[in-house]
Amino acid sequence: MRTLLIRYILWRNDGDPSYYNDDFKKLILFDELVDDDDVCTLIKNMRMTLSDGPLLDRLNQPVNNVEDVKRMIAISAKVARDIGRRSEIRWEDSFTILFRMIEKYFDDLMTDLYGEK
């Protein structure tokens, strides 16, 4: 699951077709949970610098169920899409934060996406 999410978010950042995976079709559906107009506000609330990727912990939004997990993934993907490609982005920090927030619900997410763990 971690590898899939990393590849998906990086793909959303640069659109590199070598990252594409058919599972992305399921993940991109999460975009409906986050309005495009809210992305600028979310970026502002994350107080990001030019070298930051999505810093979800700065939003102070709880993750209490699989729907919250989907929303966090959608926020990460949309922010990654909108910040543009830069070599200095510290993706490791962003992914560490994301996984720390959602790992408790990985099994639920797998069940939701694929009908199994």
From Swiss-Prot:
InterPro entries: Orthopox_N1 (IPR009353), Poxvirus_Bcl-2-like (IPR022819), Poxvirus_sf (IPR043018)
Pfam families xref list: Poxv_Bcl-2-like
Entry keyword annotation includes Secreted: no
An example Gene Ontology biological process: symbiont-mediated perturbation of host defense response
Thylakoid among keywords: no
Keywords on record: Early protein, Host-virus interaction, Inhibition of host NF-kappa-B by virus, Modulation of host cell apoptosis by virus, Viral immunoevasion
Induction details: Expressed in the early phase of the viral replicative cycle.
Protein function: Bcl-2-like protein which contributes to virulence by preventing host NF-kappa-B activation in response to pro-inflammatory stimuli such as TNF-alpha or IL1B.
UniProt record similarity statement: Belongs to the poxviridae OPG035 family.
Full protein name: Protein OPG035
Organism, scientific name: Monkeypox virus
Gene from which the chain derives: OPG035
